[in-house]
Structures are given as structure tokens and as C-alpha cells.
Amino acid sequence: PFDIPEPYVWDESFRVFYDNLDDEHKGLFKGVFNCAADMSSAGNLKHLIDVTTTHFRNEEAMMDAAKYENVVPHKQMHKDFLAKLGGLKAPLDQGTIDYAKDWLVQHIKTTDFKYKGKL
């Protein structure tokens, strides 16, 4: 597995080379960071769910348009993560924050990196 950056911010090692997706990934990092900074904030959790939903929709639309071969399992990973987020309520616990941090890092560097140059 890939290391979790500390502080938890996007850096160049996460670049997928599609500016819109890189910008959205930065927003996901910020969303998780904000939830970690104030685990009692329902607003931060809602914001994270909203930006994640929007990003997944945009990324999946690009994969569909490009007829990307791994779109089905990729969409399932998105669906599973959103289901997990949707089941959460503030206050969050450290285990949940750690899960979200790790999921995002591993997903981008393992799964998203497979579509580099293919969308």
C-alpha cells in the first residue's frame, strides 16, 4: 500500500494528468482533511459526500465516453465507498477518518492511475 501523506494534502504524486480530475481529487483531499480537523461537524461530512458524489459522476462520465475497459469494477468501488460515506453520522471517529484517508490514497494511486492516458 501507498503511504498516507502527512499533512493530508494532494501533491504531484497523485496527478492523473486530467486537470479537472486532478482539481477534484484536490477537493476530496481537502474534504477528508476538514472532516479530520473537526470530526463533530455534520457540515464537513455533508460537503465531503457532495464533492465525492460529484467527482465520481464526472470521472465515470469520462470513462464511459472513452469506453474505458475497467469502468464496471471502478464504478462498483465508487458505489461501495459512497455507501460507506452515506451511512456515516457526525461525530466521526478516528478509525473512519483513517479509512477515508487510506481509501482515497490507494484508490487514486492504484485504480485511477490505470486510466492515465486512456480517457
Swiss-Prot record:
Binding residues annotated for Fe cation 2, in chain numbering: 58-59, 74, 78, 107, 112
SUPFAM superfamilies cross-referenced by the UniProt entry: Hemerythrin-like
Keyword line: Iron, Metal-binding, Muscle protein, Oxygen transport, Transport
GO molecular function: iron ion binding; oxygen carrier activity
Tissue: Muscle.
Gene3D superfamilies: Hemerythrin-like (1.20.120.50)
Residues where Fe cation 1 binds: 25, 55, 58-59, 112
Function summary: Myohemerythrin is an oxygen-binding protein found in the retractor muscles of certain worms. The oxygen-binding site contains two iron atoms.
Similarity remark: Belongs to the hemerythrin family.
PANTHER family in alphabetical order: BACTERIOHEMERYTHRIN (PTHR37164:SF1)
NCBIfam families, A to Z: hemeryth_dom, Hemerythrin
The protein's name in its UniProt record: Myohemerythrin-1
Lineage start: Eukaryota, Metazoa, Spiralia, Lophotrochozoa, Annelida
